């Protein structure tokens, strides 16, 4: 019964965002999170809000949402995905060192290629072209189903030429 109610609320959140009712979506998401904390629906609502916040360049609140999911989720794979998103947002904030710490805090498992690519982006932003190239090559040698190999090949090609 409780999961059904949480699912219904989550559906309302997504519908509000799909109608571009950002304020309504935020309000519904916060209500869901408060009413059904520590549920997968609360985590997903936080992720939906964080995505909208990133799109609207509200990076600090997005970081807070992502950290909230990391603190509450019981899903190890979701936590790995959230860490990737958090590192990307931190990089967008110009906090490359924080992004590296976020990436290095866990063993990425099946997401190793994606972690290596983001690590490459962070190292490149820090001016470490050799480190970035090494990370991109590591990503390219990983599971090609989890990464955009075309984009990765462009990144590798650009760095290898310079």
Positions of predicted regions on the chain:
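Short extracytoplasmic
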Residues: 7-47
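Short solvent-exposed coil/turn linkers within tandem alpha-helical repeat scaffolds
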Residues: 33-42, 71-79, 106-114, 141-150
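TPR-repeat structural position
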Residues: 22-23, 59, 96, 129
């Amino acid at each position: 019964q409780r999961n059904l109610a949480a699912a219904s609320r989550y559906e309302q959140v997504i519908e509000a965002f799909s109608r571009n009712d950002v304020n309504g979506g935020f309000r519904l998401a916060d209500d869901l999170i408060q009413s059904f904390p520590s549920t997968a629906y609360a985590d997903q609502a936080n992720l939906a809000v964080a995505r909208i916040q990133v799109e609207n360049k509200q990076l600090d609140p997005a970081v807070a949402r992502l950290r909230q999911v990391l603190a509450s989720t019981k899903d190890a794979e979701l936590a790995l995905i959230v860490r990737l998103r958090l590192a990307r947002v931190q990089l967008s904030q110009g906090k490359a060192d924080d992004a590296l710490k976020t990436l290095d805090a866990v063993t990425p498992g099946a997401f190793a290629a994606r972690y290596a690519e983001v690590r490459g982006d962070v190292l490149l932003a820090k001016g470490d072209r050799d480190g970035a190239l090494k990370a991109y090559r590591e990503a390219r040698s990983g599971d090609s189903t989890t990464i955009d190999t075309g984009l990765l090949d462009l990144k590798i090609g650009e760095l290898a030429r310079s």
